[in-house]
Amino acid sequence: MVRDRVIELFRKALAQGADDGRWPAAGAGFSVEAPRDPKHGDFAVNAAMVLAKQAGRPPRELAQAIVEAVRAADTAGDLAGLEIAGPGFINVRLSPDLWLRTLARAVAEGPDYGRTAVGQGKKVIVEYVSANPTGPMHVGHGRNAVVGDGVQGLLRWAGFDVTREYYVNDYGAQVQTLARSVHLRYQELHGRTVTMPPKSYPGEYVKDIAAGLKAEYGARFLDAPEAEWLTLFRDHAVQHVLGMIRGDLAAVNISFDRWSSEKALYESGTVDRFLRFLEEKDLVYVGKLPPPKSKKGQPPAQPQPDEEGVTAAEDLTLFRSSAYGDEVDRPVKKADGTPTYFCADIAYHWDKRQRADALVDVLGADHGGYVPRLEAAMEALGASRKDLHVVLIQMVSLMRGGESVKMSKRAGTLVSLREVVDEVGRDATRFIFLTRRSDAPLDFDVELAKRQTLDNPVFYVQYGHARLAAIFQKAREAGHAVPDFDLEAARTLASPEEQDLIRRIAAFPDMLAAAALAYEPHRVAFYLQETIAAFHSWYTQGKKSGEKVIGPDPVKTAARLFLCRALKQVLANGLAVLGVSAPDRMESPETRDIADDV
């Protein structure tokens, strides 16, 4: 990375200056950032401002001394200019040849170009999807899956040791409701008339589960008390649904390294051990929740059970989360002594933290209020809040013909993720889920996703990759060998459009590293769209001006072909990070072979 070269030169200069006694040894790190205005150079460095207080010198005066040291360190001539600006920033301009050599690096590193070591092998568990095993995955789950998979992919490219994890909620009330729904369908298959309660699961898959149980057990549980069949029906239903979920995930090419079970946390004694740990650390006590707030002018609100049946009137075992920044203390045990869902959840995070250096949770935006209590739990358990990062996923509106398609798992009319993938394809599904920030709502236009036109974002990027492949096909047909890097030839890449493409290629590793550290895979999709737009513009302009990639000048042709080679590699790598294919052949938007369009 060109940025790495700037960092290397400044570190060398600062170390030499410290050895010579010109300033103290550098303590805190300095930043090297691209300025907002390109007129200010390629990078801005704040080393003088960071070191000024320690050195006891004005920042601008120190900056001048650092500039002289950096110039002395730059024996290869990689820097074209160093200027002092503002309170003491050092603006850096790189030599044209240094930029050009990034093309050679992109081609030499091939499918590994863009990988960095910023993660230093740090172990990270990325937990995503974790949809309740009560039905097939809908489109909202799909966005969580694709964003989570994008996050873990970015972290791998940045040098982290990543474990992909799915947490199966196979213990609570919802899976019991599923089991009871299956039993009703089981009765129905034996000829009885049943009425499905409002909170049951009426989907066709419930009938399939019931049919499997009927085939295996006959009428054995038709009139049996619930205690005899509930656990069996629950476990059978959960395994059936998990099989469906695995299939849905496979349709978008997502798999996991570990499937963790809530039920297993209880059966292994992890939850009980965790509660004892909380008691030993004096992190819990018996008390009542604050009474519910009443509206102004209204009588005091009466305590109502929450989703776990807990009310403010009961004596509960409360976790001291308010001491760590949460709004109130949270119940970890109900009045009857059974653990709450929150208890199992923080026990799970306790378990994860013992297996990794950092945790990433990818959650629906409706869990936003849940984040502070998780952060409080992490801090109370002796970890840092920074060891947990939560990525929130906003809603998806599935659009068809300008109208929203509703999703309702309980009504049995959901539009499943599998249906969308079958209709628009894996690549379109994955890419479109990443065309907006995850914390912003997304309209998924099914008709647009199927369209083979340049207004379809995934088609637009893939078409650019295929166009580059077609350029090389045409070059071979014209007798041009795919060139190796030639610095003299590369110096002919002098147009503003060519220089822009070179800088975009050079920026690719830094972009990936920054996206990984921000947990934002949409940045890669944005980069690809912007970069391919710059390529299409350059290519079209060249055809109009007579400066085609394959032209009469063999030196310029060789340079432009090498630029295209590096760009094609970057596009392929960027698409690979997102789990999207990079085809070499496609039909053009006018339904002719793309080779006719170069």
UniProtKB/Swiss-Prot annotation:
GO terms for molecular function: arginine-tRNA ligase activity; ATP binding. Residues 288-308 are annotated as: Disordered. Its EC number is 6.1.1.19. Its main location: cytoplasm. It comes from the Bacteria. HAMAP family: Arg_tRNA_synth. This is Arginine--tRNA ligase. It comes from Anaeromyxobacter sp. (strain K).
